Amino acid sequence: DGAFSIIRKKMVSTYNHKYDYNEIDHDYKELLIPPAEDGKHLLDMNALHIWPRGDFMLMALANQDGSFTCTLFAPKKGKNSFEKLNSKQEVEKYFSSVFPDFIGLVPDLYSQWCANPTSSLGIVRTDPWNVKGTSLIIGDAAHATVPFYGQGMNAGFEDCRILNELLDNHNENFAACFEEYSKVRKPNGDGVQDLSMHNFIVMRDKTADPKFL
């Protein structure tokens, strides 16, 4: 039932399961590059576009209608942070100085800025993922992660595949299946989260190095 799972909350409060939610120091906001007048993409549609700036970044992914969904990942507070961007003048100055080749692609930048929410990012860790043979959490309820490795949904699908295999292996003995599932999948959930945080550093910082390409 998702990253803010009620089932997990009940497991933690009733059975004293380990639980940690780590909200990272960066928030994000989505913006949109519209299509060109002829309906075509203004940037290469077959590329992942990243503007790496060390501690923060902007990225853009192509949509089928000629637009690009863009996401700014920036610190909550401090230099180059969301807390500094509270007026039209501040937002336009920020993008003009930090992303000068981007601002011209979004003519309604400030109206988008005001309309789209600034949202947080975090990682969920809990252990175990089951209560005997009565209940089990999978997907984001068990291992919600940040999006920088692009494998969160795949990890959830993998949960389903492994769970089906274990149900067969244990002849649908839920208690035995759930216990093994929790032990087998927990390290994988942690691993995807660690890789996601590592890749955030790579994307926002390391991709600026010509040697990376």
Residue ranges and their predicted role:
Residues 2, 139, 152:
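Conserved phosphate-binding and hydrolysis motifs of nucleotide-dependent enzymes
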Residues 64, 95, 159, 185-188:
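Hydrophobic/aromatic residues within well-ordered alpha-helical segments
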Residues 140, 160, 181:
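Hydrophobic, well-ordered secondary-structure elements that form the walls
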Residues 147-158:
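A conserved FAD-binding loop/helix module that cradles the flavin
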Residues 165-213:
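C-terminal helical "tail/cap" subdomain of flavin- and related membrane-associated enzymes
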